[in-house]
Structures are given as C-alpha cells and as structure tokens.
A protein has these predicted regions:
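Non-catalytic, topology-defining segments of multipass membrane proteins
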Residues: 1-29, 62-179, 246-313
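Short hydrophobic alpha-helical membrane-anchoring segments
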Residues: 10-14, 34-37, 41, 167-171, ...
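Membrane-embedded alpha-helical segments that form the functional core of polytopic membrane enzymes
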Residues: 13-38, 56, 60-70, 186-190, ...
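Transmembrane alpha-helical segments that form the membrane-embedded catalytic/substrate-channel core
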Residues: 30-39, 68-72, 129-138, 182-210, ...
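Cytosolic-biased juxtamembrane loops and peripheral soluble domains of multi-pass membrane proteins
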Residues: 38-53, 77, 82-95, 136-150, ...
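Short acidic-hydrophobic sequence patches enriched in Asp/Glu that either
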Residues: 48-56, 72, 187, 248
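Short, surface-exposed connector motifs at secondary-structure boundaries
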Residues: 175, 235-237
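ABC-type nucleotide-binding domain
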Residues: 232-233, 241-244, 248
Length: 313
C-alpha cells in the first residue's frame, strides 16, 4: 500500500517528468494486483483467523479493484471453491454449448471477447476481464450466487463506498493524474489477475467431483512474479488446501508430484496463455472445448497430456 500511496502522490504533485508516468502506472498496477492476492489469502484464513479482521483487511486489499469483501466471500470462497469447474454452476467457468446457444448475452461475450479461437480481440478479456466479471457478479449475485436480498444490498453499498472513494480521489488529483494513478494501473492489475484466473481452470475439463487434480492447473512464473502474486499460480495446491498459507505451496507441490506424478498438471504461465489463445472456450462436453463460430474442437487438458491437441474442425 505504501508503494501505491507514494507513487500516487508523486503523480499528483508532478514530482516526476511526463515520460515516467507510465512507469509509475505499471508499478501501481503491480501493487494493485499484489493487494488483491494478499486479500485472497486473507479471506481464506491463511493470514488472519478472526472474521472481522479478515473482512476489514480484505476490504482494504480489494479496494483497488472495487470488490466488496462480502461479495468475494460468497463468490470465491463459497461458490467457486465448492463447485470448481462444475459446468454452468462455477461462476468463474466458461459456459456449456447449451448455455451458449440459449443465451444471447453469453454468445456475444464468447464470440467477441473470450480469449480463444485465435481472436486478438480476446485479449480484452485480460485487460478488462476482472472488472467486467466482478460487475456482472455484483449485478446477478442473487441469481448466480443465491445471495439473499439483505446480503445483496450490503455488497452493493460496500461497492458504492469504494466507488465514492475513487471518485473523490479523482476530484482531488484531477483527471490526468487519476488516469495514471488509477485507471491505467487498474488495466495492468486486470491483466495480471486474469492471466492467472483464466489459465488456472479454463483449459481443464468440467467435473462434478470438484477434483483439483483434474479441474485445475498450476502455472509457473519467474520468482519475482511469484512474490508479487503470493504464489497464486500454485492453484492445484490451493484448491486442495485453500486455508493453508501460500508460503507452503512449493512443499505441497513436491508432495503432489511424488504421490501423483501422472495426474498433477502444471505448465509455464506463458504456455498456458498461448494454449488458451489457440483453443475454444465453450464446453461441448466435459472434455471437449469448442469454438462455435468456427466449428473447431479441442480436447481439454487431461492428466498425462502435454501437447496442444489439434483442432478437429
């Protein structure tokens, strides 16, 4: 947080020349993403045990990406973790072919913005994906998360408070400074966060058994990025032990590789993103990804496979 405050002050008070502003935006964006990953671990109980303390610290950590801590608790901790890669139930999962065909909004989103099918505009799902998805989840929480009306009002209020804070900052520092201190960093944070969220599950098969060795993928990154993201790439490990601190992720990985070497799945983050760019984002069945606009089909990432399956279009 100190990095964010110092860089924001430097931008607002013009302590740095104009060409340095994008660099500060990048630094703030990395810090925004890092705070979200800290909040993720806090809300799982990996750092704090008391519920009120978790909500308070989590709320601060999620503030840069304007996410209510109560919404995150239901969306991520309760619904996603209980239904990981359960088709048309997991809120973080791409749709089934039936849902794609039956919902115009789903078809529009997949055809125009999903990362896949070699569509370059799909990169927008990295740049804007988390902000758009969190707004969608907020608006549809009563239906997709089975949230009560009272709880929904609370998360809307929390979100409005966060929006008011950022609007107040914009009024204080001015439009140009706000663009470099918040808007551009928000895009940077989206790219970092979505690069992990998408690759951690979207290449994997659908499963009703909530089996992390089947429905999740761990992605590897340079050590500095592991540090920024609190080892979020160790995602199989996280889904097996969600309340365990990320500092134990490497040890858990070693045990999983020793116990189930044929089932544990991992690849470099860049390779996983490249595979997403090549493949479809709609599930024809549990193990087949399709691109309805082209008719292409690919096998999901199954244990024991490490080569990109050829399209059967």
């Amino acid at each position: 947080m100190s990095v964010i405050v110092l860089a924001t002050v430097a931008i607002a008070l013009r302590w740095v020349p104009g060409p340095a502003l994008p660099v500060l935006s990048l630094v703030i964006g990395l810090a925004f993403a890092g705070m979200l990953f800290v909040g993720h671990e806090v809300m799982h109980g990996g750092m704090l045990r008391g519920r009120r303390a978790r909500l308070l610290v989590g709320g601060v950590c999620f503030a840069p990406l304007i996410v209510s801590p109560h919404l995150w608790t239901v969306w991520h901790n309760r619904v996603h973790h209980a239904n990981a890669n359960r088709i048309d139930v997991d809120p973080d999962m791409y749709p089934s072919l039936a849902r794609y065909r039956n919902h115009r909004a789903v078809r529009f989103a997949i055809d125009h913005f999903a990362l896949g099918g070699r569509r370059w505009r799909g990169l927008l799902s990295l740049v804007l994906g988390f902000t758009v998805q969190s707004a969608e989840i907020l608006c549809t929480a009563r239906a997709c998360l089975q949230m009560s009306a009272r709880a929904h009002r609370r998360v809307i209020l929390e979100t409005l408070v966060l929006c008011a804070w950022w609007l107040a900052l914009a009024g204080v520092v001015g439009a140009t400074a706000f663009a470099f201190a918040f808007l551009l960093p928000l895009l940077v944070a989206n790219v970092i966060v979505m690069s992990f969220i998408l690759t951690n599950h979207s290449l994997s098969p659908a499963t009703d058994d909530n089996d992390p060795l089947l429905g999740a993928l761990s992605v590897t990154t340079p050590r500095w990025l592991e540090w920024v993201t609190l080892q979020f790439g160790y995602h199989v490990e996280h889904h097996l032990f969600p309340t365990v601190s990320a500092r134990h992720a490497r040890a858990i990985r070693a045990e999983l590789q020793a116990l189930w070497p044929e089932r544990y799945q991992s690849m470099p983050l860049a390779a996983a993103l490249a595979r997403m760019f090549e493949t479809g984002r709609v599930y024809r069945d549990a193990t087949t990804l399709v691109d309805p606009s082209t008719g292409g089909e690919w096998l999901a990432l199954l244990p024991g496979t490490d080569e990109l399956p050829t399209s059967r279009a």
